[in-house]
Amino acid sequence: MISPSTKLYGLIGYPLGHSISFYIHNAAFRALSIDALYINIPIEPESFSKAILGIKYLPIYGLNVTIPHKERIIDFLDEISVISKLIGAVNTVYLEENKWKGENTDFGGFLETLKELKLDKDLPCLILGAGGAARAVVYAVIEYGFKEIYLTNRTYGRAERIAEEVKKNKNIEIKIIPWQERHKVDEKLILINTTSIGLDGKSTPWNGNFKSIAFVYDIIYNPKETPLLSLAKENNVPFKNGLDMLIYQACLSWNKWFGFIGPFEIMKREAEKLL
């Protein structure tokens, strides 16, 4: 129930039609009797600067940030966390001591799922993509303890930049594979898709051999089963979509907004109704 003292939280990005954040956060607010409302705030890229300056003066207590604004938001914040600096992206904004601060909970959300899956750290992982999500995933797999990491992207230079930054920040070598040669890796590995290929429910970033794949992780959560995951299923390869990562990053946002981690099971139940 909205009241005169209801606190506003929201999601900024463009477009926002695919997002279920509105539903999961509001379901959790209702379940825990928190007097708050989570709203979608679609901001077109060309209007971003003016819009974000306006938002900073409105009674909004916290934000999630999605594509294409995760990198641009940094310039408008007073402080960002160490991991946000490393990744170069922020997906959670919170107000503390009258300062707007930024955190990256995509990193923590993905890391939580890796811990649950207990994937073999001795297997190499091949990460598809080199956008903001890929950066969070790269640092999460390093934190988890994978010994060998391959990275491939349609734009070779973007993958190269991530590898250079990781070498500088963590002194860890990431091997870059040209996109057109990604299927040539023939050792047993874990495949992680961070690209948007599959969002349309028709395309897949991997048409190669599944015999060398030990596990497939697609961070897309809608559709629930992307063509990549359907292929994994057909080839009897265990797989996971991005829903738990989404829920965990949402729960970790609450830690910055309210001082406690959000209710995972409540949010997940709501998400599963929608997908």
Swiss-Prot record:
Q: Transmembrane region positions?
A: none
Q: Name one Pfam family in it.
A: Shikimate_DH
Which GO biological process entries does UniProt record here?
A: amino acid biosynthetic process; aromatic amino acid family biosynthetic process; chorismate biosynthetic process; shikimate metabolic process
Cross-referenced InterPro entries, in alphabetical order?
Aminoacid_DH-like_N_sf, NAD(P)-bd_dom_sf, SDH_C, Shikimate_DH, Shikimate_DH-bd_N, Shikimate_DH_fam, Shikm_DH/Glu-tRNA_Rdtase
**Which positions does UniProt annotate for NADP(+) binding?**
G129, A130, G131, G132, A133, N153, R154, T155, Y156, G157, R158, I219, G242
Q: What is its EC number?
A: 1.1.1.25
- Enzyme class name: oxidoreductase
Looking at the record's lineage, which domain of life comes first? Bacteria
Q: Where does shikimate bind?
A: S19, I20, S21, T66, N91, D106, Y221
Catalytic reactions of this protein: shikimate + NADP(+) = 3-dehydroshikimate + NADPH + H(+)
CDD domains linked: NAD_bind_Shikimate_DH
* HAMAP family associated with the record: Shikimate_DH_AroE
What does the record note on quaternary structure?
A: Homodimer.
The name under which this protein is listed is Shikimate dehydrogenase (NADP(+))
The beginning of the lineage is: Bacteria, Pseudomonadati, Dictyoglomota, Dictyoglomia, Dictyoglomales
What gene codes for this chain? Answer: aroE
